[in-house]
Amino acid sequence: MVFPVEAIVGLVTFTFLFYFLWTKKSQKPSKPLPPKIPGGWPVIGHLFYFDDDGDDRPLARKLGDLADKYGPVFTFRLGLPLVLVVSSYEAIKDCFSTNDAIFSNRPAFLYGEYLGYKNAMLFLANYGSYWRKNRKLIIQEVLSASRLEKFKHVRFARIQTSIKNLYTRIDGNSSTINLTDWLEELNFGLIVKMIAGKNYESGKGDEQVERFKKAFKDFMILSMEFVLWDAFPIPLFKWVDFQGHVKAMKRTFKDIDSVFQNWLEEHIKKREKIMEVGTEGNEQDFIDVVLSKMSNEYLGEGYSRDTVIKATVFSLVLDAADTVALHINCGMALLINNQNALKKAQEEIDTKVGKDRWVEESDIKDLVYLQAIVKEVLRLYPPGPLLVPHENVEDCVVSGYHIPKGTRLFANVMKLQRDPKLWSNPDKFNPERFIARDIDFHGQHYEYIPFGSGRRSCPGMTYALQVEHLTMAHLIQGFNYRTPTDEPLDMKEGAGITIRKVNPVKVIITPRLAPELY
């Protein structure tokens, strides 16, 4: 993180005020506090501890190193807020089982207000009636197994189209394919089709979608940058906007919202026309479904129906277009670097499905090794290595330590899922470990929670797994892979809160099936 001079000046100006607020909250607890990492300053805490020190690894890796030194439960301060980091089975279980309701709130972040529809997006909303109603609507009506089943042919058709596009890029035995870019295009096009019924293809889509893609990338950057208000939540840092973040967020939000507003208006007009004619119309997409289920008074909490729909659409795009593509990208890179596992997966598909047709979703249940691969990739590279931060609404106890109200929780899932006490050879890619190990994704096995656990677990898990299994199955079945240099792909991870590879997956591919199948 880089801290501008003007930000530091503003920080120093209000040091004494913050110090007063900080010390006023301090009360001696009945139980011991967790270990706190050294090096913190009065008031600002450990803000500079994670500054640009030449270590460009993901934050989860850095916090994992601190866990090795200070234990699986420790704290530090980012300005005023106290941050609790947990990475052991016992501590994770305490947080998401014993104290699940207590830790169900979300901390306030500036991007949630200016980019997240004033925290109307489900993953940003505080635990309460709005969150419960919205989550129920999404799980039962939008992302339920029965609803996703109706979109099965959409997923298959989109993946097939993308596979054919990939096939057309093959030029002899020396053409290099950027698989990372291909996966991003596939997942973005798929979720846009399912949400808004639009057919998007890079370079051929409408101008609105292209503008949204740029704004979406800006959102990802802005949501991960250090913002003074997040560490010192007083109105001054919104009004003065030392770092220029508020201005940038407002500009980016305007571009994002204009696209969603246009999609929404198109669907409202279509719905009105259908009601006039008295027919059901064409197949419903996600916006159609939400419009039919949500009245203007349905959710309340100060949000309009249109705001909630747009916030819900944004949440779905965020999870599906970025997170799913990121995970499949890591999975394919691991398989390309582990050709024995790739060949074993290909042999399983050849045996169970054959080479005369493509894998379908109904085949996945029989592809045991493929399922193990997906689980192993999620173990090594969880979509949210620290999950989305939680915040406790009252004092509680975690692993015998007193945790005061208002503490922000970082659950280091990446560290947990590579714990040598829980996993043999934890850093090794070994899908076989899940063949004999009966473990699922639902968050009740506290050594393995790639989609989180408890009330705030990811509602898009079923969709993500469907797309990941089917996409990887097609890529495994359809092609052989090698790197341009015949050396393993670089798996180096970039800085930030996600596990994003620094270098894209660039490979040379050759088809495995008959030409007429592509």
From Swiss-Prot:
Gene3D superfamilies, per database record: Cytochrome P450
Main location group: membrane
Cross-link (Glycyl lysine isopeptide (Lys-Gly) (interchain with G-Cter in ubiquitin)): K254
Location within or outside the cell: Membrane
Pathway annotation from the record: Alkaloid biosynthesis; nicotine biosynthesis
An example Gene Ontology molecular-function term: monooxygenase activity
Keywords for the protein's UniProt record, in alphabetical order: Alkaloid metabolism, Heme, Iron, Isopeptide bond, Membrane, Metal-binding, Monooxygenase, Oxidoreductase, Transmembrane, Transmembrane helix, Ubl conjugation
Tissues in which the UniProt entry reports expression: Expressed at low levels in green leaves.
Transmembrane portions of the chain: 2-22
Cofactor: heme
Pfam families with a match to the protein in the record: p450 (PF00067)
Record EC number: 1.14.14.-
GO biological-process terms attached to the record: alkaloid metabolic process; nicotine biosynthetic process
Domain of life: Eukaryota
Gene Ontology terms: cellular component: membrane
Effect recorded for C330W: Confers nicotine N-demethylase (NND) activity
Class of the enzyme per the UniProt entry, highest EC level: oxidoreductase
Membrane topology: Single-pass membrane protein
Binding-site residues, heme: C458
Family according to the record: Belongs to the cytochrome P450 family. CYP82E2 subfamily.
Known role: No nicotine N-demethylase activity.
Protein name (Swiss-Prot/TrEMBL): Cytochrome P450 82E3
Species whose genome carries this gene: Nicotiana tabacum (Common tobacco)
